Amino acid sequence: MKLKGEVALVTGGGAGLGRAIVDRYVAEGARVAVLDKSAAGLEEIRKRHGDAVVGIEGDVRSLDSHREAVARCVETFGKLDCLIGNAGVWDYQTQLADIPDNGISEAFDEMFAIIVKGYILAAKAALPALYKSKGSAIFTVSNAGFYPGGGGVLYTAGKHAVIGLVKQLAHEWGPRIRVNGIAPGGILGSDIRGLKTLGLQDQTIATMPLADMLGPVLPTGRVATAEEYAGAYVFFATRADTVPLTGSVLNIDGGMGVRGLFEASLGAQLDKHFA
């Protein structure tokens, strides 16, 4: 068990990638507090993991919600070793030209309030407890933090901002607290919702044929599931193996940045030599 005795707080842990992180952390011996807006999602986690988890229903746009989550975490488990800022929303690749003039300010505010301010508020609330435990913070970025097309103009700008947040907090908090990011690519079965201000709140990535869209253009040849991404969050939360690791963002997106000009990858050519 790689996280035995550790305590984590996961925002947006009620479903999707966040839920997979919670499940994996518990399997690795950690106890986990989960901040999520879905009471039903939190109840499912409680039934699955029992006393190893504590759920806090709240809004990641509220500092009070984050403070309550940290307080409940420390009250229940005695400490906080690792903050995972993960709650998110997507713009379904909405381009700037398609955002109406009378909705752009509201859409910007909604996006950045969740994926940027929400992380900053989580960090602010968790700082005293993380300082005490000499722990770490991990923020979910995205391949959109590195490349265009992983979202629209709002999501891509927001995820680039998260990379800046990771680097700045690593500078401000080192050497007392480590801060890193993890940038997944497409997630098979993800249920991340769209911006309400753009009328996308009922859409989920789960309805998109991601395997067909992305699999052929990735060097890995397939789209990973949330469970397959969760292992990276375990590694970043370990203490003994990550002593020099801070201010880093792990780009874990199936090799999107090393695609060839004409083919995604050339590994199939090895078959004629070794198959």
Swiss-Prot record:
KW Electron transport (keyword) present: no
Keywords: Aromatic hydrocarbons catabolism, NAD, Oxidoreductase
UniProt GO MF annotations: oxidoreductase activity, acting on the CH-CH group of donors, NAD or NADP as acceptor; oxidoreductase activity, acting on the CH-OH group of donors, NAD or NADP as acceptor
EC number: 1.3.1.119
Domain of life: Bacteria
Gene3D superfamilies noted in UniProt: NAD(P)-binding Rossmann-like Domain
GO biological process: catabolic process
Catalytic machinery residues: Y155 (proton acceptor)
InterPro entries xref list: BphB-like_SDR, BphB_TodD, NAD(P)-bd_dom_sf, Sc_DH/Rdtase_CS, SDR_fam
Catalytic activity: (1R,2R)-3-chlorocyclohexa-3,5-diene-1,2-diol + NAD(+) = 3-chlorocatechol + NADH + H(+)
One protein family per Pfam: adh_short
Pathway(s) it belongs to: Aromatic compound metabolism
Job of this protein: Can transform various dihydrodiols of chlorobenzenes and chlorotoluenes into the respective catechols.
Family: Belongs to the short-chain dehydrogenases/reductases (SDR) family.
Protein name, UniProt field: Chlorobenzene dihydrodiol dehydrogenase
Record organism: Cupriavidus sp. (strain PS12)
